[in-house]
């Protein structure tokens, strides 16, 4: 089987969004992730940044490669960078000229700020009816009390309920280990933009897409939100355990913890056989998942005692042989030492920063996979190139 990283666009398999131009006024994570998804799919993304400073994430290190933080590099491949001071007539003029050539404009300023820059989205779409615009906000432009509040991921993790269900049962609320809600919001925004482009191609008219970090975050609560809305259950923290499935959590073997995911009664019965207690599957307290959820505090200590008798690799081998989903809990070095993790790494020959190793796009098509056409840009790297394009002159 071919390595997915070898399945790259060619002259006969152009990238799906080839020919689409995106003006990217976003920064930090959610917006840049959205535009990176579009760039990976072939769009020409022009990232507009503040002169001398650029996207804040350029400075969110160490570690750094060259002058830019790894954080920035993880979100900005396949883009071009131009600098523009939106507080100056020249900067605003540049954005207007870019928009005149664009299919999509994406921004994540606080509500109302684009109009202060003389870049009101309604005015832009009136001048360019085919333009798709996308705003990523913290709480939505219409939120009465919170519209102007900044939307850092950790703030919304706290306000959306995510932190209330994350952490050990008797511990403090804990944030997720990555800015997961920014990632989810960026993906929702990309879906919305793609849908608006599809509609634009059919009708000839663009549409405004709006995604609020808070809204996407509450939507991401899925079953936990439904447990409350339907059952009136205020969920709490369960560590690695699942509120609706038992056993579905980490257990500590003799040497280290691992994950067990017995997602149905059949898998639970197999687990009981593996640990040498087949009778547990017939115990009325544990025979069904509903019963196991009710009697969680009786079952988990029994399983914990059994799993403490062997080393992790022994249990994983036995569970895997029985067809029970299980996995080691891996650190980053273990992830990228595994065959699966290594296959997701792309090596990029960056003429400024040297050889970069970054995580590649996870999207696969039957005959291609998005690849890094260009490394993440240095600040203002394409100032001359893009301005010459707008003037109709040759590339430098």
Locate each region found by the language model.
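Conserved Rossmann-fold dehydrogenase catalytic segment
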Residues: 141-142, 170-178, 201-217, 236-243, ...
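Substrate-binding strand-loop-helix patch
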Residues: 70, 217-219
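Acyl-CoA thioester-binding alpha/beta core of soluble enzymes
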Residues: 1-52, 108, 127, 132-134, ...
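Short linear motifs in exposed loops
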Residues: 85, 167, 210-212, 261-262, ...
